[in-house]
Each structure stands twice: as structure tokens, then as C-alpha cells.
């Protein structure tokens, strides 16, 4: 008689190990991943995070994100799922939708919201899919002028974003001298291009948008107006910048930037009566709800990330508190203090200041560029990102640095602290110029980095500045989960 392939004792041992695997904490189960997370946690703790699109989520948000909701699959919408066992998932999604409308003061009879997008880029593409036919026309702020990749970016030689591949895209621009959006040129180009959708949104623009002007341009051309408020959604919630909801048909956003939630997306859309015929009294109603919901699911996504929806719901509750509004006011105050300090040190800030959470520093007058400065600052534990400035000839060597205040404001930095941060940045850029002088202005970024790493005097300067930066940064607690 043949013996069983697996003996019972061995099966029991394996099952015991399986149970142990499920119950082990990360540090015991996967030390490699655990150590990477610990290193990243330490980098965030000892460094100065100035990337404008980043923030530090609260402990409550991260707890929701790491909950059992990760286990549940739930294709469809509340009350209309393709899976059983979704009673509490429905309850959660409806709560998140309710809070999303409340935080922006929206009447549920006039506005709806889809909270299932995985992030901002899928949210935007869902709107385009819903409202613009294939190869239909879209206008968004050009990426080198402060727009976002998903707003239709392309170069003279190549269509880069999927938006520009599947739709016809014409960018609008800023005035290269002032850095402000050229609304007159936008109006003229829209008249010639006849877009189906105009996008009012930015990723590196420090001034408030003129939503009323944009809506008039959209109406004159029979276009929808969509706001992408991903960067400023927390500021809008707190009432410290103008709201797009008064003028726009659709509003999309991420949830992890100034809103300080986890990584996800939302799409708000108008509903109810769109217009009334003055002669007949006949009402025309918006049909955006069905179009957008169908585009998100089943058009572009499968099951929603329920753990992320929970994290968003928690962040939205926090966003309705007085302390959150105070935080957002401080974000703007800190940004203005940073801008003023850098201008006082001789730097040119595009548009001469900021209305929101970010600034763009133009380094052309200093004789260097954003790529080199970013690398030196990173070596000194200051995280920011290179960015094109208005008038840049090539995106391969952008002239600017984008700096944002949301993350460090979450750690408790105030105006005087940001003035100190400005001096750290200044010293990093001065070091950038020294290395550039040594290697030559025409050297490649690779050659520049080799000089930075190989020259003892430069390494001494980096080490000294990094020590000061890290000593300063560790004075401020890092939000999040204990132990991480």
C-alpha cells in the first residue's frame, strides 16, 4: 500500500508554521522590508521634507489604512455590489461620501462624489473618459508652466501622457515674464480650438486660479470646466484659498497632499437641474453622476481599495476641525515666510510670492539649475524637487526648485523655523555653485555628482551642513505610527 505523499505530522508542522507566519510582526517575518521601512522612517525624521506634494498622515489615518478592510473585495457601489458580505463596506463608503460633501460645504442635492479612484491620475482619466469622447479636445496648463502630467502633456516630438495619446490636447501657458497664467491667450486659443473640457489645475503654480474667468471661457466654448485641486484640497477645505466648487462642473483631487490623508482620489460632480428653458420652463438635468461612476467602475477600475477609503474618511473628519483650519493657515503663513526669506537672500521666486503652500525658486540668476541643487540639498538631508520655470528651453535641465510647506508644518514648524530652513537651502545652493565652479558649468549631471562624491572639501561641507540640518529637524516630532 502506497504511503501518503504528505505525512500527517509534517502537515501539522507546516500548518503550525503557516499560523506563525500569519501572526508574526513584520520585524520578525520579513526583516529586509522592515529594515527598509525603518531606514525610510529615519530619513523622514532627521530630514527636512520640502516636496510640495508630500505630507505626514496622522496615526489614525495610517491605522485605518492598515486595517482588516484591506481584506475585503467589493466591486460596484453601495447597494449594488457584485460580491456578498459588503454591508459594512457600504456603510463606510457612504460615510466617506457624506464627509467629503460636508467638508466642502456642498449640498447633496446639487453635488455627488465618487470616492473609489485609486489616486489622482486615475481620477482625472476617469473624468476625461466620462466627458470627452475618444480624441476629443482638452485644454490644461502646460507641464513646464506648472500644470500636471495628466493634463495632456506632450512635447514637439512625442505624446507623453496617456491623456495626450487618447485625447487631443492643447496646453495653455503662463506669461514667461510674470509667471502668471495668460488668461487672454487662453481665451483666444479656446475660441480657435473648441475644447470639450478645460482643466483648472496645477502642480507647481503659487497663485490662486481665476475660476470665474475660466468658467466664462468654458461656457463661451460649450466646454466643461474641471478643477484638479489635488495640491490645494486641504487649503480649500479650510477656506484659506478660493473654492473651485462655485464655478466648476467637476472637481477632482488626491487626498494625501494638503488634505493629509492616505493615497487615494475623489471626483466631485454636479447633479440636479443644469438649466431651465426660459420659454417652456423645461428643466435640463446633469447626467454627470452616471457618466463618471461608470467610467470609474467598470470602465477603468475593479474593486475599490476599502482600506484607503477608510483612511480618506478619517482624514475628512479631521479636516472639519478648527485645528485643521489653523494648520492650513499656518501652511500658507510658513510658505510666505519661506518666500520672503529666500528673496531676502537674493533669490528670484516666480510670481514674486505665493497664495498657497508652494513656491518655485528660479535659479537662472544664480547660474545653476534645479537638478544640481536638488542633488546637493538631498545629500544635506533636505528633500525638494527640480522643476521647470517659465521660459525654460529644456525640461532635461530645469531651472527651478519647487518648495512646499505642508509636511514640515505638520511637524510643527512656524515662520521663524522656515526662515532658518531658508538659510539651510541657501548654504546648499552656495555649495552647489562651488562644486559647479570646480567641475565646469558645461559638465553633465553625472560629472557633477562624481565631483560632489569624490572631492574631500565638498564632502566635508556636506557633512557639516547635514549635521546641522538633522540636529534641527529632530527637534520636531514626526507624526504617524509609533515604531515607524
Curated annotation (Swiss-Prot):
It catalyses: (6R)-5,10-methylene-5,6,7,8-tetrahydrofolate + glycine + H2O = (6S)-5,6,7,8-tetrahydrofolate + L-serine. GO terms for molecular function: glycine hydroxymethyltransferase activity; mRNA 5'-UTR binding; mRNA regulatory element binding translation repressor activity; protein homodimerization activity; pyridoxal phosphate binding; serine binding. SUPFAM superfamilies: PLP-dependent transferases (SSF53383). GO terms for cellular component: cytosol; mitochondrion; nucleoplasm. Its main location: cytoplasm. It is found in: Cytoplasm. Pathway: One-carbon metabolism; tetrahydrofolate interconversion. Its cofactor is pyridoxal 5'-phosphate. The modification N6-(pyridoxal phosphate)lysine is found at residue 257. It is an enzyme of class 2 (transferase). Pfam families: SHMT. Its EC number is 2.1.2.1. One of its GO terms (biological process) is tetrahydrofolate interconversion. The modification N-acetylalanine is found at residue 2. Keywords: Acetylation, Cytoplasm, One-carbon metabolism, Pyridoxal phosphate, Transferase. In eukaryotes there are two forms of the enzymes: a cytosolic one and a mitochondrial one. Homotetramer. Identified in complex with ABRAXAS2 and the other subunits of the BRISC complex, at least composed of ABRAXAS2, BRCC3/BRCC36, BABAM2 and BABAM1/NBA1. Belongs to the SHMT family. Interconversion of serine and glycine. This is Serine hydroxymethyltransferase, cytosolic. It comes from Ovis aries (Sheep). The gene is SHMT1.
